[in-house]
């Protein structure tokens, strides 16, 4: 089970962005706002204020080991959540520095963000992350992961049901594909699930 922790690193003018977030919220078809979008900010805040804690308590009660895909900026802003993650012994893979779309970000900027994410992870958890998942990656992301060379696995792929090796010259990278079919985000998208029964069938 993977718990994505992104709240606090999304597009928001408070983070220096030009527009509000539009991705993965309960506001279907949200349009970017050039300024503060109080409803969107509040929806994202739910994850750090209530969502994480509800799931964390459930996982602890049922003794379920999980992996947290943690966005560096979001983790840095929420030390109480980081403490809970450490105390629980969850694996934490890096989910990048920001929860933004890297499609049109320069490779040099994306590389800088990757370094920031790794440094922040080391500062918080005392070691570098073993896994990487940007989520909204670019055509450069896999190159940067392999150039870094320190990740046991990369999950920026949806291309298989099983892990596989990507080989480029003398370098190889374990790919553990991500899945959107087994993701609760499908409850928040218009092509997604309508009921819990749809999810389980």
What is the predicted role of each segment?
Residues 1-176, 180-181, 199-201:
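Catalytic alpha-helical scaffold of carbohydrate-active enzymes acting on polysaccharides/glycoconjugates
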Residues 183-201:
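Aromatic-anchored helix/helix-loop segment that forms the rim or "lid"
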């Amino acid at each position: 089970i993977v718990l994505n922790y992104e709240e606090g690193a999304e597009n928001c003018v408070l983070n220096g962005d030009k527009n509000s977030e539009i991705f993965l919220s309960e506001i279907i078809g949200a349009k970017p706002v050039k300024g503060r979008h109080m409803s969107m900010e509040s929806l994202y805040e739910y994850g750090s204020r209530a969502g994480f804690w509800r799931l964390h308590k459930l996982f602890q009660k049922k003794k379920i080991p999980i992996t947290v895909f943690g966005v560096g900026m979001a983790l840095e802003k929420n030390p109480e959540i980081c403490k809970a993650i450490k105390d629980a012994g969850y694996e934490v893979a890096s989910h990048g520095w920001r929860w933004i779309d890297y499609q049109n970000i320069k490779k040099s900027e994306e590389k800088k963000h990757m370094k920031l994410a790794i440094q922040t992870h080391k500062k918080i958890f005392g070691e570098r992350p073993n896994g990487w998942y940007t989520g909204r990656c670019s055509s450069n992301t896999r190159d940067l992961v392999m150039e870094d060379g320190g990740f046991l696995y990369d999950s920026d792929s949806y291309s298989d049901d099983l892990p596989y090796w990507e080989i480029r010259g003398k370098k190889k990278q374990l790919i553990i594909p991500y899945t959107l079919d087994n993701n609760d985000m499908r409850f928040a998208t218009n092509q997604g699930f309508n009921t819990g029964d749809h999810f389980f069938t």
